[in-house]
Amino acid sequence: MEQYEKVEKIGEGTYGVVYKARDRATNETIALKKIRLEQEDEGVPSTAIREISLLKEMQHRNIVRLQDVVHSEKRLYLVFEYLDLDLKKFMDSSPEFAKDQRQIKMFLYQILCGIAYCHSHRVLHRDLKPQNLLIDRSSNAVKLADFGLARAFGIPVRTFTHEVVTLWYRAPEILLGSRHYSTPVDVWSVGCIFAEMINQRPLFPGDSEIDELFKIFRITGTPNEETWPGVTSLPDFKSAFPKWPAKDLATQVPNLEPAGLDLLSSTCRLDPTRRITARGALEHEYFKDIKFVP
């Protein structure tokens, strides 16, 4: 750890404390994540080390680069490129952002580029939210943070500071207890983030797992075997769930153009097998006026 000098604590993420730090060798500013392990006395699980090592291979302009992994005295430090702005802070400080449909489209496109890259390497995020979409102020590039960490460390119910980990972006198959979910969970999260950029408020702001599910079902309609084959077999599905009819998504996101609404509805399909893929979303007509392909 001698190589890195902590400058200041900048936040407390899902997995531990995040510091702004300096690489003594290059003088570069970096972000240092100290991973808090549940079984501290047992040291770092080898599975976590393996997973994290794979993430060093992931290099893409829309992913926050993992530069180094430092494993010392039962502690694990992850060294990332330093970015001090995230999408949540950006939205909170820019009330005009919702009116800039072009900017929203560019952000969404970049988020999907990063996700498509990760999915092509069989890496899931599982906990996408505006707080872990970082923005490079100099280029307006959006970069995804914390990709792959859920598989290495699991997603705790609470952060180590006892904040509840948000459920607002969590896919219905996870909320219903599915153990066999895959890449569509990230696409669901992106749909929620897309709607939030347009509306300037979260689409499904549930305060518990059941409240989250019901907020979703009130808009999408309560699923059944016809609309989502296999749903009644999921561990946490209850036949006593209220049976809400589906609403037109246009009533929930009134300021979105028709092509955007079509894309949004294809990310927010309850049945994960019918949800659009990240790669498919990039080819959607909503993006037809975007010239560059990162």
Swiss-Prot record:
Gene3D superfamilies found in the cross-reference section: Phosphorylase Kinase, domain 1 (3.30.200.20), Transferase(Phosphotransferase) domain 1 (1.10.510.10)
Cell cycle found in the keyword field: yes
Tissue occurrence: Found in most organs including root, young leaf, stem, vegetative meristem and flower bud.
Domain Protein kinase positions: 4-287
GO biological process, one term: regulation of meiotic cell cycle
EC number annotated for this UniProt entry: 2.7.11.22
One Pfam family recorded for the sequence: Pkinase
Post-translational modification Phosphothreonine, affected residues: T14, T161
Protein species of origin: Medicago sativa (Alfalfa)
EC primary class: transferase
The protein, known as: Cell division control protein 2 homolog 2
Phosphotyrosine found at: Y15
Coiled coil: none
Modulation of this protein's activity: Phosphorylation at Thr-14 or Tyr-15 inactivates the enzyme, while phosphorylation at Thr-161 activates it.
Domain of life according to the entry: Eukaryota
InterPro entries: CDK, Kinase-like_dom_sf, Prot_kinase_dom, Protein_kinase_ATP_BS, Ser/Thr_kinase_AS
Keyword list, A-Z: ATP-binding, Cell cycle, Cell division, Kinase, Mitosis, Nucleotide-binding, Phosphoprotein, Serine/threonine-protein kinase, Transferase
